[in-house]
């Protein structure tokens, strides 16, 4: 399969919501500096993922691919195709819940995408997600973010919404302080930022 031919960083994104938005944001952030290959549209299914990964070429410097599942057993095949080096877990919600016995079971299935990644980015404030990551004894770097835990890798000090803009103030790894502005105010987009 063509993925093995490319020894480059590959970001794998999963979650119940926000996969496409986060993928497109990462593309916008990375593409001025790097040649990025990404999933077209919302190609995150058993058919869409292979089509997306086939887009990798000799010029690609980093790949960004979504992985979506709707039932148990689907993520292992997607993991084998994407082979991510970095993982992003956007959110854990009730989408496609009807095929899973519990939210925890769905979370554990989604986390299979990140089995061999060097790092995973996720919300520590989602207790189910945080507990599932702890239970899996994840070996990579946990780049957790939190609005509650000052010791999180990315601590959100404050979120200020004004007019149609949101300002997020943060502390990175308890050392670097900064802020960024978003051109929207809805909670889902702010959380995925």
Spans of features found by a protein language model:
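Adenine nucleotide phosphate-binding catalytic loops in nucleotide-utilizing enzymes
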Residues: 103-104, 140-193
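Phosphate-binding loop of NTP-binding sites
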Residues: 1-125, 129-141
